């Protein structure tokens, strides 16, 4: 059964001029994102024939609603006790077009590790603000754990990119500790309490980047406003995942960032684990910084 959490009852944005502005601005960016994904789709490698990709709708905790996901499965992998990796795409919490951008990452994991990879979707802001996205991610984890006849529940891992990494770490706090054995977080926004959180300027002081995207501060402000309602306490750990309770963090983890906007947010999570974690957590976590790379360099 889903673990109900107090923040789950928080209401949506109120319908007012501010919300109307958010919707219009976000939809404008969504249109640009769909165009960008269409024009650059040929640059992203397709999965090879040695991994099958299927589509699935799995049940959410909300009656009558389902969540979409792509499942990557190596050809020849036998049914029963299959290890599982769950991936959560980046989106700025608001852009649906980026679902599927991690397809080659998912393919490589499935191929090399001989595991099932579930690339899950989630609800987007501002129509579905905090905490609905992370609830969908936790529902995916719970759905996997409801199938012990199919999956090896002792080998379930999790990853996320950007906003998806934030949602992944938030979801860790909504499930029973130990359900996830390892986490990979790529440049997660982690501290909404910082005065710079909505501007995206907490970065390592690099100016030149080889690849990736340098997001403008006003775009960060928009995504933050769309995702976080005004009444939400920014210090709640399911939003500011830097403060995730240590007991909810797996013993193994990898935190990855380029030298752009999310560098400090990422390295501070790692530093906190090294400071407060158990001996197993301290030994099992790593930080990987990629010099001269911007946001979404991968």
Where are these regions (language model features)?
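An N-terminal hydrophobic leader/cap segment in hydrolases
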Residues: 12-59
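Alpha/beta-hydrolase superfamily serine-hydrolase fold, recognizing
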Residues: 8-15, 54-298
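Short, low-complexity, Lys/Arg-enriched N-terminal segments of secretory-pathway carbohydrate enzymes
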Residues: 1-3
